[in-house]
C-alpha cells in the first residue's frame, strides 16, 4: 500500500515578493480611489454651499460681452458655446501661422549657422543665443507694448501703397470676398488636383513599362493653371477685393490683424525659430560629409546639394525634436492671456469662467482642447516621420 504525500501548502508571508507586490498594488488602488472620492465629495459639498450647479448647461446661456477678434459671426447675445468655438479658432489660427513661420525662419537661420560667410554665421549665432534665452512671455510683452502699441493712430498710420495700413489699431489690409464664381472655382481646383494625381500615376506606369520619361512637373503645373483659368472665364472671378478706407477715427472695410495677434504671432515665431534653427543645424551636421563630397564630385552646386542630398537625409534626425517645438508653440499660445488676445485661456478659461463660476467644467474643457491639439500634432508628425524613415532590406 502506497501513501501519496502532497506538497506542503505555502503560508502567506510578507517576506514573499509576490505577496508584497499584490499588497502594495491593493494599497495603491485603495489610496487612489479614496483620494478621488474625497476630492469629488469635497467639490460637490463646496459647490452646494455656494449654490453652484454642475453640468454643461451654461454653454447655452447668452455671453453678453464683445470679442475683439472672431473668425465667425458673433454678437453679444450669442451663447458661451459660440464663445468657446471662437476661442478655439483663434488658438488654432495662432498655432498654425506660428508653426509655418517658425519652420521657415528656423530653417533659414539653421542653414545660416553653417554658412562659410563669417558675417552671416555670426548674425545667425547671435539671433539664436539672444532669442532662445529670453522667456516667451517677455518677448510677447515687448512686441505688444514697445512696438505695436507705439504705432501712430489710424489717421497718421503708415501707408503702404494705399493698400496696407499699419497703426496702433493693427494692420488693415484688403479682404478677399467670395463672388458668384467661387464654388465653381473650388470645384475646378479639386478636378485639377485629381487630374494631376491620375496623370502622375499614368506617367509612372509608362516609365516603368517603356523607360521613357514624362515631364510630370510641367504637365501638372499646366493642369493646375489651365483648368481653374477656364473656369474663371466661364463663371467669372471667384473673389473680389474690399479695400480698407479711413472713416472717422478708424478704418472700415477689409481685414484687420489686431495688435494682440501680431505681437503674439511674431513673438512665438521668433522664439520657437531659435530652437528650430539649432535642430536644423544639428540635423545637417549629422549627415556624413562624404555625402556632400559625393554630390560635388557629380557636379552638383552647393544649393542643389543641400536641397536634394543633405536636407532629405537630415529630416530623419530633425523631425522628432521638431515635433516637440511644434507642441511647445501650440501650448505657449496660452501666454496670450498676458496681452488680452481672445484665445482659449484668456477668453474661455478667463472671461467665461469669471462670469459663470463653472470652474471644473471650463478648466476641463480647456485642458481637453490643448490635449487634443497636442495629440493631433504628435500623430501628424509621427505619421510623417514614418513616411521618411529609412527602410532597411
Q: Predicted segment positions?
A:
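Transmembrane alpha-helices and adjacent helix-loop boundaries
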Residues: 2-393
Amino acid at each position: 500500500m502506497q501513501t501519496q504525500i502532497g506538497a506542503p501548502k505555502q503560508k502567506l508571508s510578507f517576506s514573499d515578493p509576490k505577496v508584497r507586490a499584490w499588497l502594495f498594488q491593493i494599497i495603491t488602488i485603495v489610496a487612489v480611489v479614496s483620494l478621488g472620492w474625497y476630492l469629488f465629495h469635497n467639490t460637490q459639498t463646496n459647490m452646494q454651499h455656494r449654490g453652484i450647479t454642475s453640468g454643461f448647461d451654461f454653454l447655452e446661456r447668452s455671453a453678453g460681452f464683445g470679442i475683439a477678434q472672431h473668425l465667425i459671426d458673433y454678437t453679444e447675445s450669442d451663447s458661451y458655446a459660440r464663445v468657446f468655438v471662437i476661442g478655439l479658432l483663434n488658438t488654432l489660427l495662432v498655432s498654425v501661422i506660428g508653426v509655418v513661420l517658425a519652420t521657415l525662419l528656423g530653417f533659414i537661420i539653421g542653414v545660416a549657422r553653417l554658412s562659410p560667410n563669417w558675417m552671416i554665421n555670426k548674425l545667425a549665432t547671435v539671433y539664436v543665443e539672444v532669442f532662445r534665452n529670453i522667456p516667451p512671455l517677455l518677448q510677447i510683452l515687448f512686441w505688444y507694448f514697445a512696438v505695436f502699441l507705439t504705432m501712430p493712430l489710424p489717421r497718421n498710420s503708415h501707408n503702404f501703397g494705399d493698400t496696407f495700413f499699419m497703426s496702433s489699431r493693427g494692420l488693415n489690409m484688403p479682404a478677399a470676398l467670395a463672388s458668384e464664381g467661387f464654388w465653381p472655382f473650388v470645384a475646378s481646383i479639386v478636378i485639377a488636383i485629381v487630374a494631376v494625381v491620375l496623370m502622375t500615376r499614368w506617367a509612372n506606369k509608362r516609365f516603368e513599362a517603356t523607360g521613357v520619361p514624362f515631364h510630370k512637373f510641367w504637365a501638372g503645373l499646366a493642369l493646375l493653371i489651365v483648368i481653374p483659368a477656364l473656369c474663371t472665364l466661364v463663371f467669372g472671378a471667384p473673389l473680389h477685393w474690399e479695400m480698407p478706407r479711413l472713416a472717422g477715427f478708424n478704418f472700415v472695410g477689409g481685414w484687420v490683424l489686431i495688435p494682440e495677434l501680431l505681437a503674439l504671432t511674431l513673438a512665438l515665431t521668433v522664439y520657437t525659430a531659435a530652437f528650430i534653427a539649432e535642430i536644423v543645424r544639428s540635423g545637417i551636421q549629422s549627415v556624413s560629409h562624404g555625402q556632400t563630397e559625393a554630390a560635388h564630385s557629380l557636379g552638383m552646386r552647393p544649393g542643389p546639394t543641400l536641397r536634394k542630398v543633405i536636407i532629405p537625409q537630415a529630416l530623419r534626425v530633425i523631425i522628432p525634436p521638431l515635433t516637440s517645438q511644434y507642441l511647445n508653440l501650440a501650448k505657449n499660445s496660452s501666454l496670450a492671456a498676458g496681452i488680452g488676445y481672445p484665445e482659449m485661456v484668456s477668453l474661455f478659461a478667463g472671461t467665461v469662467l469669471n462670469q459663470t463660476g463653472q470652474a471644473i467644467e471650463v478648466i476641463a474643457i480647456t485642458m481637453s482642447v490643448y490635449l487634443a491639439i497636442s495629440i493631433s500634432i504628435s500623430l501628424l508628425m509621427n505619421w510623417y516621420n514614418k513616411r521618411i524613415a529609412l527602410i532597411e532590406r
